[in-house]
Amino acid sequence: MAQVNKRILIVDDEKDVGRTLKLILENYGFDIDSFTDPVVALEKFKPNLYDLTILDIRMPKINGFELYQQLKSRDPKIKTLFISALSYLTAYKTHNSKLYPIEGERQFIKKPVTNKELLEQVYSMVR
């Protein structure tokens, strides 16, 4: 598959989920950095390096909403695709976090996600 010259950061504490997302996207030419620990991902994050971040919402140490806030403070232009087994509103209520509207640079997909859903969402966000 041809390289699409887009770099994506994936943070999901479920190793198998992160690995699967990485393999799917790499097969379509994306350059992927994947982490299971949100603290390590935050330490390694560099502004203006990523075209998209894919963040699980339910993670230990730092949930996806908190991680998003910290990444966004370092790179205001970052686009984020939240992914969770919970609905977006349930995840928000569970973590008592700031509710981010799902629009433009912020989108949400509920697990389990199909390859087609994932690719459609990713391509629409990295244009």
Name each model feature, range by range.
Residues M1-R7, T114-R127:
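Non-catalytic signal-transmission and effector/linker regions of two-component phosphorelay proteins
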Residues D12, D56, S84:
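Active-site residues of response regulator receiver
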Residues K15-D33:
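Two-component/phosphorelay signaling modules centered on CheY-like receiver
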Residues S34-L52:
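Acidic, metal-coordinating helix/loop segments flanking the phosphotransfer/catalytic sites
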Residues T36-D37, N63-L67:
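Acidic catalytic/metal-coordinating carboxylates
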Residues E43, F65-I78, S97:
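Short amphipathic alpha-helix used as the core "switch/output" element in two-component signaling
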Residues M59:
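Receiver (REC) domain active-site loop signature in two-component systems and cognate sites
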Residues E66, S87-I109, K116, E120:
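Alpha4 helix (beta4-alpha4-beta5 surface) of REC/receiver domains from two-component response regulators
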